[in-house]
């Protein structure tokens, strides 16, 4: 692990400086550690070192805030320690008007944008939580002020905390190879065919080339998208040498916007779309059971898309229903047009083609790849952490 600490200045005899010096000295037992101050070329060093974690130690400082925001924009994992700077007495009594202006200009935004905060006691954590700017705040005591923890223990706990941050944002580290592996595994896990040639050789080679770190990210993603049992089944069918990782034991922060865990309702259209329900009822025959079910599932998928909670599991359920049932494809398209979700449905078919390898003979109508599809991807499948 490569760690980059930033503090405005290091001064001999200063409590914060002594804390940073002790922390970084002990962390070198576990990682590559470098410290920068305001006089260093922060951006140049960060781009050269490519750290896994950037830890900012500052509050109410414009330069530190700008550097933190730059690091966030560049995709680095950024941790912020304000060292009591957000406490009520400091905000309200010390240059109150100036701090309010700084809050509006940059401080609140910085706290909100970083991956997480690290504080040194529970009181500081509660005061920071009260502001509502950041929910991901953990406590690791300062060994200089708390005799119950040694310097080495403090360093070890911060390394574990950094790993927690990195495991929370694992999607940022996922490569196209890992994403392709997920899609291949879904295709195999959902297949009802008994053929041994479910995947072309290049996709099989991709799966057999994955290392343990890549498998770890794939399985974390499978948990978050509620497709773990499908992935596990595919691993078994393909007899892949995947590591046995119990992802439930991996420490992570809660997702900002977790996916909907419930399956797509197949009986009724949920939510506040009475006109959609009415249009379905007006244009469906009683004997068109499968057409009705698919239309309902697509309507419910449309609602989840708007809530940004559409998951890979929902796509998998649609894939199974569309591929492994007999129905009148022209009637399905007609009903979806009356329901006014036909274009959305075509985009979903495109997702099934791209992500689950839905073959041409099983597509009920032509898929649609447009800006609307990009919007669905952005709302539901782009770096959710």
Where are these regions (language model features)?
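Active-site proximal beta-strand in glycosyltransferases
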Residues: 3, 53-55, 70-88, 118, ...
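Short N-terminal targeting/anchoring amphipathic segment
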Residues: 45-64, 77-79, 308
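Conserved NTP-donor binding/palm subdomain of two-metal-ion nucleotidyltransferases/polymerases, i.e.
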Residues: 167-265, 269-385
């Amino acid at each position: 692990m490569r760690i980059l600490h930033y503090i405005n200045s290091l001064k001999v005899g200063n409590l914060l400086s002594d804390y940073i010096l002790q922390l970084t000295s002990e962390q070198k037992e576990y990682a590559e550690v470098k410290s920068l101050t305001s006089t260093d070329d922060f951006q140049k060093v960060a781009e050269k070192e490519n750290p896994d974690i950037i830890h900012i130690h500052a509050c109410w400082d414009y330069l530190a805030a700008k550097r933190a925001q730059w690091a966030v924009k560049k995709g680095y994992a950024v941790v912020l320690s304000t060292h009591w700077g957000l406490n009520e007495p400091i905000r309200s009594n010390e240059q109150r008007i100036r701090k309010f202006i700084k809050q509006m200009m940059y401080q609140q935004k910085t706290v909100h944008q970083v991956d997480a905060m690290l504080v040194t006691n529970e009181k500081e954590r509660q005061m920071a939580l009260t502001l509502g700017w950041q929910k991901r705040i953990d406590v690791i005591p300062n060994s200089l002020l708390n005799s119950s923890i040694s310097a080495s223990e403090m360093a070890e706990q911060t390394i574990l905390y950094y790993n927690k941050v990195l495991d929370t944002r694992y999607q940022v580290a996922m490569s196209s190879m890992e994403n392709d592996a997920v899609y291949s595994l879904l295709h195999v896990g959902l297949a009802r065919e008994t053929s041994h040639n479910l995947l072309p050789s290049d996709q099989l080679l991709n799966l057999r080339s994955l290392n343990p770190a890549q498998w770890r990210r794939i399985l974390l993603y499978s948990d978050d998208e509620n497709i773990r049992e499908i992935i596990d089944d595919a691993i078994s069918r393909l007899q892949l040498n995947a590591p046995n990782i119990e992802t439930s034991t991996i420490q992570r922060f809660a997702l900002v916007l977790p996916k909907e865990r419930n399956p797509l309702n197949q009986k009724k259209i949920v939510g506040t779309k009475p006109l959609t329900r009415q249009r379905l009822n007006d244009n469906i025959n009683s004997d068109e059971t499968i057409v009705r079910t698919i239309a309902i599932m697509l309507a419910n998928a449309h609602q989840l898309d708007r809530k940004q909670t559409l998951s890979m599991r929902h796509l998998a359920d649609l894939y199974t229903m569309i591929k492994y049932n007999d129905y009148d494809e022209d009637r399905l398209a007609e009903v979806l047009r009356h329901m006014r979700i036909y274009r959305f449905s075509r985009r979903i078919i495109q997702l099934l083609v791209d992500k689950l390898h839905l073959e041409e003979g099983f597509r009920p109508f032509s898929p649609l790849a447009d800006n609307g599809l990009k919007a669905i991807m952005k709302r539901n499948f782009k770096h959710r952490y």
